[in-house]
């Protein structure tokens, strides 16, 4: 009797195990577009690598004193932590390997920059994809990568060379990203064919803070002047390095529809600390009175007015103005 009972338990366990295996297989097959978009963004190398692991591991040798001596005396793990802190990099939750979340491993030890370089940040120790990376030091990182490559006699690549004549960002957390797009598009025709003989375009260099991506779904247009309609194609502009021809963009278009789905799936993270309800209510009333006309409102019924406000430098228009 006892033997039959244990056999029944065994059969039940086997059935449960097979059911669980089937469930996990179904879940794997049923990856949503948003999940697929984030997976692609965080694991697929769309560009050539900017540097390799050897270069990254030796960046500390370019640092000023006393930081360089502190790094020299530290172990490899502590030097890595110091480098992540210096350049505004974070660990990649759930992704194995030494490469920071802001980059993708090309499978040969190369670090390939991704959209998450500017669009994955950290607050109070928590890594949040979609949060502006207010700590990213692209200019400093690129300068020190170039110096390290020259010492190691490694070849320079597009980022190392382009940054000699073009500012990448004047402060941590900001980049000259709009001009990156202007420069890359200048050498393409309407069919995205590359024309290397074209002159360099006139550019107005200026730094931008990256926006929080969970607000994108509220907008019809992107950027401060709303000149680009929201969609998956504007997301692809930073892939326009010359080695990526028109056929690559046709191949990748559906993948960036998934990336857009990920962006539109994002919600603002909940504030983790205590809230002064009275003060928040007073702030909400002030925000609706003074700011909401231009900046929109939040919550389940939130709206974004998509206003383009002309700015006369001699008489700037304040938020809430009816002019």
Language-model regions: role of each:
Residues 25-30:
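Boundary at the C-terminal end of the N-terminal hydrophobic targeting segment
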Residues 93-106, 261-287, 296-311, 315-316:
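Electrostatic cytochrome c docking/interface patches
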Residues 112-122, 213, 259, 283-298:
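The canonical Cys-X-X-Cys-His
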Residues 1-8:
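N-terminal secretory signal peptides that target proteins for export/translocation
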Residues 45-49, 53-54, 65-251:
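Extracytoplasmic redox metalloprotein regions
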Residues 11-22:
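Bacterial N-terminal signal peptides
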Residues 215-219, 252-265:
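Glycine-rich, acidic and aromatic/proline-enriched surface loops and short helix-turn segments
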Residues 31-61:
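N-terminal module-boundary/linker segments of secreted carbohydrate-active enzymes
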